[in-house]
Amino acid sequence: MAAKEVRFSSDAREKMLRGVDTLANAVKVTLGPKGRNVVIEKSFGAPRITKDGVTVAKEIELDDKFENMGAQMVREVASKTNDLAGDGTTTATVLAQAIVKEGAKAVAAGMNPMDLKRGIDLAVEAVVKDLTKNAKKITSNSEIAQVATISANGDTEIGRFLAEAMQKVGNEGVITVEEAKSLETELEVVEGMQFDRGYVSPYFVTDAEKMRVEFEDPYVLIHEKKLSGLQAMVPLLESVVQSGKPLLVIAEDVEGEALATLVVNKLRGGLKVAAVKAPGFGDRRKAMLEDIAILTGGTAISEDLGIKLENVTLNMLGRAKKVVIDKENTTIVDGAGRKKDIEARVTQIKAQIEETTSDYDREKLQERLAKLAGGVAVIRVGGATEVEVKERKDRVDDAMHATRAAVEEGILPGGGVALLRALKALDAVKPDNPDQKAGVDIVRRAIQVPARQIIQNAGEDGSLVVGKLLEKNTYNWGFNAATGEYQDLVGVGVIDPAKVVRTALQDAASVASLLITTEALVAEKPKKDVAPALPPGGGMDF
């Protein structure tokens, strides 16, 4: 086991505080509409230019092991806030720095760290209640566009695209962000459920020009196993022919005699049919077939359920308004599933998303949720250079998460004003002792810092402007850093999602209060590189 280095009490906290400051100072220059960019060196390719707090935080590693511990703890704050709310990472970092700084001073003055932590927790709880009480629900499309525009650092085009995408696919729908091949940013919406499997054979094509299959009002057979012989399906196929409707077969694979028979029937015109392979693999395939069954109001034919193919009747097949299949994708539009069943399935998938610890699983579950709940929108971000496209893509990602958060928990005035207005809520907090009161006062000072930083980044005097704001009692009245005017912030669209402000404060307080209560740091001693011995020298007589 390698030797360790240990630091104690004020020495330990001082080192950690230095690391916290290094990271937070690099991140906080990006805060607000007039925040600056940070340029990050990449190990290959051009440097990356960003105004996204979490991207900056993730790039910072310090030489000194003890300082690095402090920096990594604050980096954790930014990452956690980003995962939960998708934005507010810079605010969270600034809050964490303020709480750690004030807390370290209080501990150095001889206060009990555990009571300070209790005081901080009491204060945070009071502020969160105040934020929740004052949050305004958003409903209109223009409000959604405003939130998106602010999170995208004032880019109205991004705001417009996001509002349009959310209107089309709903709040649960998946919005993916890709890099475009052109200068323009564009939006493409896929309605209904789409999965990445195309037709098994090109002979199924109904539109030869576009090389795709289009069915109106088809039946959908969902089968979990391979189909190689059609003997068991003959009665079902006869019923489908009599109904005069097309049939889409989704199975693990369709091969041999089964495929030949379906193709021949299609070419002779007796049966409008198309077959596609089932999406996904293993357990995920089962779950996705079940999703398709619920969406179309059919039954997934599976031996687990004891249903054999020969016993399948027409009423066990799913129905949809339209199905479009091309070489690579199948889209089912407007399935005939019962709304109640689809909602129950959506709730079940949401519960799984909450429980899962794997990012990959979460992403796949969210895809399934979107396909059931509304559809998929793709925003393709354009730009003149690769660096510009990457930077805009970062901002679209931020804006998308912030907009979702705003729809979820409502909006508050932006510019750090909501936290300033929450100062009043702290007057009602009843701490048990002077040390807890000091903890409440730490939060009282910390929640003024984001507003000050935004104002400072805009080139104004932070303390002066914050003093002016606190003199006036109107909740939405604040300083618009973009224009340099005092106005009703919600009225002019300077807003923050309540979830983002709440998450930033809770995460910052959680990590910062742990740093305050730290009394010892343990790190590995750096290994001394010993130069290898030189090989023995030979004589010169050869």
From Swiss-Prot:
<keyword id="KW-0963">Cytoplasm</keyword>
<feature type="binding site">
    <location>
        <begin position="480"/>
        <end position="482"/>
    </location>
    <ligand>
        <name>ATP</name>
    </ligand>
</feature>
<keyword id="KW-0143">Chaperone</keyword>
<keyword id="KW-0547">Nucleotide-binding</keyword>
<feature type="binding site">
    <location>
        <position position="415"/>
    </location>
    <ligand>
        <name>ATP</name>
    </ligand>
</feature>
<dbReference type="InterPro" id="IPR001844">
    <property type="entry name" value="Cpn60/GroEL"/>
</dbReference>
<dbReference type="GO" id="GO:0042026">
    <property type="term" value="P:protein refolding"/>
</dbReference>
<dbReference type="Pfam" id="PF00118">
    <property type="entry name" value="Cpn60_TCP1"/>
</dbReference>
<dbReference type="InterPro" id="IPR027413">
    <property type="entry name" value="GROEL-like_equatorial_sf"/>
</dbReference>
<dbReference type="InterPro" id="IPR002423">
    <property type="entry name" value="Cpn60/GroEL/TCP-1"/>
</dbReference>
<dbReference type="InterPro" id="IPR018370">
    <property type="entry name" value="Chaperonin_Cpn60_CS"/>
</dbReference>
<comment type="function">
    <text>Together with its co-chaperonin GroES, plays an essential role in assisting protein folding. The GroEL-GroES system forms a nano-cage that allows encapsulation of the non-native substrate proteins and provides a physical environment optimized to promote and accelerate protein folding.</text>
</comment>
<dbReference type="GO" id="GO:0005737">
    <property type="term" value="C:cytoplasm"/>
</dbReference>
<feature type="binding site">
    <location>
        <begin position="30"/>
        <end position="33"/>
    </location>
    <ligand>
        <name>ATP</name>
    </ligand>
</feature>
<comment type="similarity">
    <text>Belongs to the chaperonin (HSP60) family.</text>
</comment>
<dbReference type="GO" id="GO:0051082">
    <property type="term" value="F:unfolded protein binding"/>
</dbReference>
<feature type="binding site">
    <location>
        <begin position="87"/>
        <end position="91"/>
    </location>
    <ligand>
        <name>ATP</name>
    </ligand>
</feature>
<feature type="binding site">
    <location>
        <position position="51"/>
    </location>
    <ligand>
        <name>ATP</name>
    </ligand>
</feature>
<comment type="subunit">
    <text>Forms a cylinder of 14 subunits composed of two heptameric rings stacked back-to-back. Interacts with the co-chaperonin GroES.</text>
</comment>
<dbReference type="GO" id="GO:0016853">
    <property type="term" value="F:isomerase activity"/>
</dbReference>
<dbReference type="GO" id="GO:0005524">
    <property type="term" value="F:ATP binding"/>
</dbReference>
<dbReference type="InterPro" id="IPR027410">
    <property type="entry name" value="TCP-1-like_intermed_sf"/>
</dbReference>
<keyword id="KW-0413">Isomerase</keyword>
<feature type="binding site">
    <location>
        <position position="496"/>
    </location>
    <ligand>
        <name>ATP</name>
    </ligand>
</feature>
<dbReference type="InterPro" id="IPR027409">
    <property type="entry name" value="GroEL-like_apical_dom_sf"/>
</dbReference>
<protein>
    <recommendedName>
        <fullName>Chaperonin GroEL 1</fullName>
        <ecNumber>5.6.1.7</ecNumber>
    </recommendedName>
</protein>
<dbReference type="GO" id="GO:0140662">
    <property type="term" value="F:ATP-dependent protein folding chaperone"/>
</dbReference>
<keyword id="KW-0067">ATP-binding</keyword>
